[in-house]
Amino acid sequence: MSNYKTSEHYGHALSHIHDTGFAGVAEAAADMLISTLKASGLTRGRVTDLGCGSGILARKLLDQGYAVEGIDQSVAMLALAKSRAPEAVFRRESLLECEIPPSIAVCAIGECFNYRFDRNNDEAALDRVLHRVHQSLEGGGIFLFDIATPDRIMKAPPKQFYQTQNWTTLVENIHSETPLMITREISSFVRAGEYYERVDETHHLRLIDPDT
């Protein structure tokens, strides 16, 4: 086994794992969004995907005739997205500070508003993002998002384990009540020929109370 290293957030190894092992969330969100758009009579137009990841949602939207603009901070994720959905426009920017173009829909799937990849992620920053989303949406537009809430402290198991033939991922969830946060210590082992490469990442998620 090779020496391990600490990666950027969603570096090459974890981006590959997320893309191949956890596509279901983005696929389900895309199906829900497409169904809602069509039911609303919105069959053409731009969808802005905040935290677009590897472009799974973008691909499905493009296949239905929508234009897509995706924004993410991970170089590795954006490389996957550009390969999967070359017709889309992708930008590497902070979700907290990016410009959001006029859109018939904006989506932010995968708890991207919770991640503290940008240290400026706080209630004021989230308020500003939501204001920009509101300004960007055309009449009748749709905003689809998810967030991790404080009850995640009770729901998230202390440790999680995922494995395929080509990779193994171990996740330790560390809870904090002051402030309300979850820290995920992620160790990934990815097959590289006859060996496995270990890559560690630490993700901090600010838990958001929807009632505040």
Regions found by a protein language model. Name each.
Residues 96-106:
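A short acidic, Gly/Pro-enriched loop at the edge of an enzyme's catalytic core
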Residues 124-139:
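A short glycine-rich, Lys/Arg-flanked "PGG" loop and its adjoining helix->strand segment in the class I
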Residues 104-124:
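A short SAM/SAH-binding and catalytic strip from SAM-dependent methyltransferases
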